[in-house]
Amino acid sequence: MLMQIADFEIGLNNPLFLIAGPCVIESEALVMDVAGELKSITQQLDMPFIFKASFDKANRSSHLSYRGPGIEKGLTILEKVKKTLEVPIITDVHEDTPLQEVAAVVDVLQTPAFLCRQSNFIRSVAACGKPVNIKKGQFLAPWEMKQVVAKAWATGNKKIMVCERGYSFGYNNLISDMRALAILRETACPVIFDATHSVQLPGGHGTNSGGQREFVPVLARAATAAGIAGIFMETHPDPDRALSDGPNSWPLAKMQPLLETLKELDKVVKNAGFLEQSSE
Protein backbone atom coordinates (compact mmCIF):
# COMPACT_ATOMS: atom_id res chain seq x y z
CA MET A 1 0.00 0.00 0.00
CA LEU A 2 1.31 3.43 -0.96
CA MET A 3 0.75 6.45 1.25
CA GLN A 4 1.30 10.13 0.54
CA ILE A 5 3.24 12.10 3.17
CA ALA A 6 3.82 15.76 2.28
CA ASP A 7 5.43 15.65 -1.18
CA PHE A 8 6.54 12.00 -1.27
CA GLU A 9 5.03 8.52 -1.27
CA ILE A 10 5.97 5.73 1.12
CA GLY A 11 5.54 1.99 0.78
CA LEU A 12 7.39 -1.32 0.82
CA ASN A 13 8.55 -1.01 -2.77
CA ASN A 14 9.42 2.67 -2.55
CA PRO A 15 12.83 3.94 -1.40
CA LEU A 16 13.48 3.87 2.33
CA PHE A 17 12.37 7.00 4.19
CA LEU A 18 13.55 8.35 7.53
CA ILE A 19 11.75 9.49 10.67
CA ALA A 20 14.31 11.07 12.98
CA GLY A 21 14.98 13.75 15.58
CA PRO A 22 15.59 14.12 19.31
CA CYS A 23 13.35 12.22 21.71
CA VAL A 24 12.01 15.38 23.29
CA ILE A 25 12.14 19.11 22.57
CA GLU A 26 14.90 20.35 24.87
CA SER A 27 15.19 23.83 23.36
CA GLU A 28 14.32 25.62 20.15
CA ALA A 29 18.01 25.95 19.27
CA LEU A 30 18.72 22.24 19.63
CA VAL A 31 15.65 21.25 17.64
CA MET A 32 16.49 23.65 14.81
CA ASP A 33 20.10 22.47 14.72
CA VAL A 34 19.20 18.78 14.63
CA ALA A 35 16.44 19.25 12.06
CA GLY A 36 18.72 21.35 9.87
CA GLU A 37 21.51 18.77 9.96
CA LEU A 38 19.11 15.91 9.22
CA LYS A 39 17.61 17.81 6.30
CA SER A 40 21.09 18.42 4.88
CA ILE A 41 22.04 14.74 5.20
CA THR A 42 18.83 13.41 3.68
CA GLN A 43 18.96 15.88 0.82
CA GLN A 44 22.45 14.66 -0.04
CA LEU A 45 21.20 11.07 0.06
CA ASP A 46 17.93 11.85 -1.73
CA MET A 47 16.11 10.17 1.17
CA PRO A 48 12.58 11.29 2.15
CA PHE A 49 12.59 12.65 5.70
CA ILE A 50 10.09 13.42 8.47
CA PHE A 51 11.34 15.31 11.52
CA LYS A 52 10.32 13.89 14.91
CA ALA A 53 10.33 15.48 18.36
CA SER A 54 7.94 15.33 21.32
CA PHE A 55 6.49 18.25 23.28
CA ASP A 56 5.40 15.99 26.17
CA LYS A 57 6.84 12.62 27.17
CA ALA A 58 3.92 11.38 29.25
CA ASN A 59 5.37 7.95 30.06
CA ARG A 60 8.70 8.78 31.73
CA SER A 61 9.90 6.28 34.36
CA SER A 62 10.07 8.93 37.11
CA HIS A 63 7.74 11.83 37.84
CA LEU A 64 10.89 13.92 38.32
CA SER A 65 12.14 13.34 34.76
CA TYR A 66 11.97 16.08 32.13
CA ARG A 67 8.84 15.70 30.01
CA GLY A 68 9.18 18.56 27.53
CA PRO A 69 8.12 22.18 27.09
CA GLY A 70 4.41 21.43 26.89
CA ILE A 71 1.98 21.68 24.02
CA GLU A 72 1.84 25.46 23.49
CA LYS A 73 5.56 26.12 23.35
CA GLY A 74 6.26 22.74 21.75
CA LEU A 75 3.89 23.24 18.83
CA THR A 76 5.28 26.74 18.27
CA ILE A 77 8.77 25.26 17.92
CA LEU A 78 7.62 22.42 15.67
CA GLU A 79 5.74 24.86 13.46
CA LYS A 80 8.90 26.96 13.14
CA VAL A 81 10.87 23.89 12.07
CA LYS A 82 8.23 23.04 9.49
CA LYS A 83 8.03 26.53 8.00
CA THR A 84 11.69 27.50 8.22
CA LEU A 85 13.23 24.23 7.02
CA GLU A 86 10.27 23.05 4.93
CA VAL A 87 10.24 19.53 6.35
CA PRO A 88 7.20 17.47 7.40
CA ILE A 89 6.70 16.91 11.13
CA ILE A 90 5.62 13.95 13.25
CA THR A 91 4.95 14.08 16.99
CA ASP A 92 3.30 11.80 19.51
CA VAL A 93 -0.04 12.41 21.16
CA HIS A 94 -1.66 10.99 24.29
CA GLU A 95 -5.15 10.40 25.64
CA ASP A 96 -5.47 13.90 27.09
CA THR A 97 -3.88 15.71 24.12
CA PRO A 98 -6.11 18.19 22.22
CA LEU A 99 -5.74 16.26 18.99
CA GLN A 100 -7.11 18.83 16.54
CA GLU A 101 -4.72 21.45 17.89
CA VAL A 102 -1.76 19.17 17.17
CA ALA A 103 -3.15 18.00 13.83
CA ALA A 104 -3.36 21.61 12.67
CA VAL A 105 0.45 21.86 12.89
CA VAL A 106 2.02 18.48 12.19
CA ASP A 107 1.89 16.21 9.15
CA VAL A 108 1.77 12.86 10.96
CA LEU A 109 0.35 11.90 14.36
CA GLN A 110 2.07 9.15 16.34
CA THR A 111 0.47 6.95 18.98
CA PRO A 112 2.70 5.58 21.78
CA ALA A 113 3.29 1.83 22.01
CA PHE A 114 1.78 1.65 25.49
CA LEU A 115 -1.55 2.98 24.15
CA CYS A 116 -1.98 0.80 21.06
CA ARG A 117 -4.76 -1.25 22.70
CA GLN A 118 -6.78 1.80 23.81
CA SER A 119 -9.57 1.56 21.25
CA ASN A 120 -11.17 4.97 21.80
CA PHE A 121 -7.77 6.64 21.65
CA ILE A 122 -6.76 4.93 18.40
CA ARG A 123 -10.10 5.83 16.81
CA SER A 124 -9.90 9.44 17.98
CA VAL A 125 -6.40 9.92 16.57
CA ALA A 126 -7.30 8.30 13.24
CA ALA A 127 -10.50 10.38 13.03
CA CYS A 128 -8.36 13.52 12.74
CA GLY A 129 -7.75 12.45 9.14
CA LYS A 130 -3.98 12.85 9.29
CA PRO A 131 -1.52 10.05 8.54
CA VAL A 132 -0.94 8.07 11.75
CA ASN A 133 2.08 6.06 12.86
CA ILE A 134 0.83 3.42 15.31
CA LYS A 135 3.66 2.02 17.40
CA LYS A 136 3.16 -1.64 18.25
CA GLY A 137 3.14 -2.40 21.97
CA GLN A 138 6.08 -4.29 23.43
CA PHE A 139 3.49 -6.76 24.74
CA LEU A 140 1.76 -7.46 21.43
CA ALA A 141 2.32 -10.18 18.83
CA PRO A 142 2.73 -8.77 15.31
CA TRP A 143 -0.42 -10.43 13.98
CA GLU A 144 -2.48 -8.67 16.66
CA MET A 145 -1.80 -5.36 14.95
CA LYS A 146 -4.40 -6.23 12.31
CA GLN A 147 -7.12 -5.51 14.86
CA VAL A 148 -5.49 -2.24 15.91
CA VAL A 149 -5.32 -1.13 12.28
CA ALA A 150 -8.96 -2.18 11.76
CA LYS A 151 -10.01 0.19 14.56
CA ALA A 152 -8.21 3.05 12.85
CA TRP A 153 -9.52 2.19 9.40
CA ALA A 154 -13.08 2.07 10.76
CA THR A 155 -12.94 5.88 10.98
CA GLY A 156 -12.47 6.07 7.21
CA ASN A 157 -8.81 7.06 7.52
CA LYS A 158 -6.67 4.58 5.58
CA LYS A 159 -3.43 6.55 6.03
CA ILE A 160 -2.05 4.28 8.74
CA MET A 161 1.53 3.12 9.31
CA VAL A 162 2.61 0.46 11.81
CA CYS A 163 5.89 0.67 13.71
CA GLU A 164 7.85 -2.21 15.24
CA ARG A 165 9.87 -1.29 18.35
CA GLY A 166 10.81 -4.57 20.02
CA TYR A 167 9.29 -7.12 22.40
CA SER A 168 9.53 -7.37 26.17
CA PHE A 169 11.95 -10.18 27.04
CA GLY A 170 12.03 -10.69 30.78
CA TYR A 171 12.60 -7.67 33.01
CA ASN A 172 14.07 -4.42 31.63
CA ASN A 173 14.92 -5.88 28.24
CA LEU A 174 13.65 -5.87 24.66
CA ILE A 175 14.45 -8.08 21.70
CA SER A 176 13.64 -7.70 18.00
CA ASP A 177 12.15 -10.47 15.87
CA MET A 178 12.76 -9.72 12.20
CA ARG A 179 9.97 -12.11 11.21
CA ALA A 180 7.59 -9.56 12.70
CA LEU A 181 8.38 -7.10 9.91
CA ALA A 182 7.10 -9.53 7.28
CA ILE A 183 4.07 -10.39 9.41
CA LEU A 184 3.24 -6.71 9.91
CA ARG A 185 3.09 -6.27 6.12
CA GLU A 186 -0.09 -8.36 6.26
CA THR A 187 -1.83 -5.33 7.77
CA ALA A 188 -1.47 -3.76 4.28
CA CYS A 189 0.11 -0.72 5.96
CA PRO A 190 3.61 0.69 5.44
CA VAL A 191 5.90 -0.89 8.05
CA ILE A 192 8.40 1.21 10.02
CA PHE A 193 11.21 -0.11 12.21
CA ASP A 194 12.21 1.87 15.30
CA ALA A 195 15.92 1.10 15.59
CA THR A 196 16.56 3.17 18.70
CA HIS A 197 13.71 2.24 21.05
CA SER A 198 14.37 -1.39 20.11
CA VAL A 199 17.70 -1.20 21.98
CA GLN A 200 16.13 0.42 25.03
CA LEU A 201 16.36 -1.25 28.45
CA PRO A 202 13.00 -0.04 29.86
CA GLY A 203 13.31 1.19 33.43
CA GLY A 204 16.73 -0.43 33.56
CA HIS A 205 18.27 2.43 35.55
CA GLY A 206 15.53 2.61 38.15
CA THR A 207 14.35 6.19 37.66
CA ASN A 208 15.06 6.12 33.93
CA SER A 209 15.52 3.68 31.07
CA GLY A 210 18.86 2.37 29.93
CA GLY A 211 19.88 1.37 26.45
CA GLN A 212 22.49 -0.25 24.24
CA ARG A 213 23.00 2.26 21.46
CA GLU A 214 25.94 0.28 20.05
CA PHE A 215 23.37 -2.15 18.64
CA VAL A 216 21.35 0.50 16.77
CA PRO A 217 23.22 -0.02 13.46
CA VAL A 218 23.00 -3.80 13.84
CA LEU A 219 19.21 -3.77 14.13
CA ALA A 220 18.80 -0.99 11.56
CA ARG A 221 20.74 -3.01 8.98
CA ALA A 222 18.85 -6.19 9.80
CA ALA A 223 15.44 -4.52 9.52
CA THR A 224 16.34 -2.80 6.26
CA ALA A 225 17.50 -6.12 4.84
CA ALA A 226 14.23 -7.74 5.97
CA GLY A 227 12.28 -5.14 3.99
CA ILE A 228 10.61 -2.06 5.44
CA ALA A 229 9.08 1.16 4.19
CA GLY A 230 10.86 3.41 6.68
CA ILE A 231 13.36 3.59 9.52
CA PHE A 232 12.77 5.49 12.78
CA MET A 233 15.74 6.72 14.83
CA GLU A 234 16.04 9.17 17.67
CA THR A 235 19.25 11.16 17.48
CA HIS A 236 21.05 13.78 19.56
CA PRO A 237 24.29 15.79 19.22
CA ASP A 238 25.40 14.50 22.64
CA PRO A 239 23.32 11.46 23.66
CA ASP A 240 25.00 11.14 27.05
CA ARG A 241 23.57 14.55 27.96
CA ALA A 242 20.15 14.11 26.34
CA LEU A 243 17.22 14.83 28.65
CA SER A 244 15.30 11.75 27.51
CA ASP A 245 16.30 8.39 26.00
CA GLY A 246 19.97 9.30 25.73
CA PRO A 247 21.23 5.73 26.26
CA ASN A 248 19.41 4.52 23.15
CA SER A 249 19.76 7.63 20.97
CA TRP A 250 22.14 7.49 18.00
CA PRO A 251 24.78 10.27 17.80
CA LEU A 252 23.90 12.90 15.22
CA ALA A 253 27.50 12.92 13.95
CA LYS A 254 27.15 9.24 12.99
CA MET A 255 23.80 9.50 11.22
CA GLN A 256 25.11 10.04 7.69
CA PRO A 257 27.36 6.97 7.43
CA LEU A 258 24.62 4.77 8.89
CA LEU A 259 22.00 6.15 6.51
CA GLU A 260 24.36 5.67 3.56
CA THR A 261 24.63 1.98 4.44
CA LEU A 262 20.87 1.61 4.91
CA LYS A 263 20.16 3.28 1.58
CA GLU A 264 22.41 0.83 -0.26
CA LEU A 265 20.95 -2.16 1.56
CA ASP A 266 17.41 -0.98 0.84
CA LYS A 267 18.17 -0.63 -2.85
CA VAL A 268 19.61 -4.15 -3.12
CA VAL A 269 16.76 -5.78 -1.22
CA LYS A 270 13.97 -4.00 -3.08
CA ASN A 271 15.56 -4.57 -6.49
CA ALA A 272 15.76 -8.29 -5.71
CA GLY A 273 12.16 -8.53 -4.54
CA PHE A 274 10.66 -10.44 -1.64
CA LEU A 275 10.70 -14.19 -2.16
CA GLU A 276 8.70 -14.76 1.03
CA GLN A 277 5.67 -13.19 -0.64
CA SER A 278 5.53 -16.13 -3.07
CA SER A 279 6.97 -18.85 -0.80
CA GLU A 280 3.80 -20.93 -1.00
Curated annotation (Swiss-Prot):
GO terms for cellular component: cytosol. Pathway: Carbohydrate biosynthesis; 3-deoxy-D-manno-octulosonate biosynthesis; 3-deoxy-D-manno-octulosonate from D-ribulose 5-phosphate: step 2/3; Bacterial outer membrane biogenesis; lipopolysaccharide biosynthesis. It is an enzyme of class 2 (transferase). Its main location: cytoplasm. Its EC number is 2.5.1.55. It comes from the Bacteria. It is found in: Cytoplasm. The keyword Cytoplasm applies. It catalyses: D-arabinose 5-phosphate + phosphoenolpyruvate + H2O = 3-deoxy-alpha-D-manno-2-octulosonate-8-phosphate + phosphate. One of its GO terms (molecular function) is 3-deoxy-8-phosphooctulonate synthase activity. HAMAP family: KDO8P_synth. This is 2-dehydro-3-deoxyphosphooctonate aldolase. It comes from Coxiella burnetii (strain RSA 493 / Nine Mile phase I).
